[in-house]
């Protein structure tokens, strides 16, 4: 899966403005009008159909909203509320949690709780998050989200997120 950034000649943009991190693989093209097109490679994008099926199965089993992200966007979502998240850019908080390779279970009032997307309404009260690691690199996250604060997430949800992240990371290595 690729993400495109196209800018006219003469426009100067910082690497951070385009959400390009040091070491990110890019392809550079020019079109007929002379515009530069950057294609950013997303390793999880290769597994988007498989990741979607995995998320759907996990959502049906747990009853939670399940999100699978790369380091830039929500790649797939399954469960109640998925339309609000699928394809949206992730928040700086989540980007930091991924780069720090965090795995946690948190409630909305906990310091570790992160907004998933830039425009996350904050209607979910609990989350279990696990970073996807592939060949030693943090490439995304698996997040289980729960709206109802009365039905507490447990270590089971945390372990399910960790197992899903581990499995997806191993699939990427093949």
Language-model regions: role of each:
Residues 15-77:
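Intrinsically disordered, low-complexity terminal regulatory regions
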Residues 45-57, 88-96, 141-174:
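Juxtadomain coupling helices with adjacent low-complexity linkers
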Residues 2-9, 13:
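Single conserved hydrophobic/aromatic residue that forms the stacking wall/gate
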Residues 38-41, 78-81, 117, 147-149:
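Short hinge/gating elements
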């Amino acid at each position: 899966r690729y993400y495109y950034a196209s800018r006219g000649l003469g426009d100067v943009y910082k690497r951070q403005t385009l959400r390009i991190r040091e070491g990110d693989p890019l392809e550079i093209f020019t079109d007929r009008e002379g515009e530069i097109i950057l294609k950013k490679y997303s390793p999880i994008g290769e597994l988007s159909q498989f990741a979607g099926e995995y998320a759907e199965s996990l959502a049906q089993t747990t009853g939670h909203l399940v999100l699978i992200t790369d380091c830039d966007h929500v790649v797939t979502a399954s469960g109640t509320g998925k339309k609000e998240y699928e394809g949206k850019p992730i928040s700086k908080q989540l980007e930091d949690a991924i780069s720090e390779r965090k795995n946690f279970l948190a409630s909305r009032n906990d310091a570790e709780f992160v907004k998933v997307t830039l425009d996350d309404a904050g209607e979910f009260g609990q989350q279990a998050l696990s970073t996807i690691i592939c060949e030693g690199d943090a490439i995304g996250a698996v997040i289980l989200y729960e709206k109802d604060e009365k039905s507490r997430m447990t270590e089971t949800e945390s372990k399910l997120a960790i197992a899903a992240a581990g499995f997806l990371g191993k699939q990427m290595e093949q």
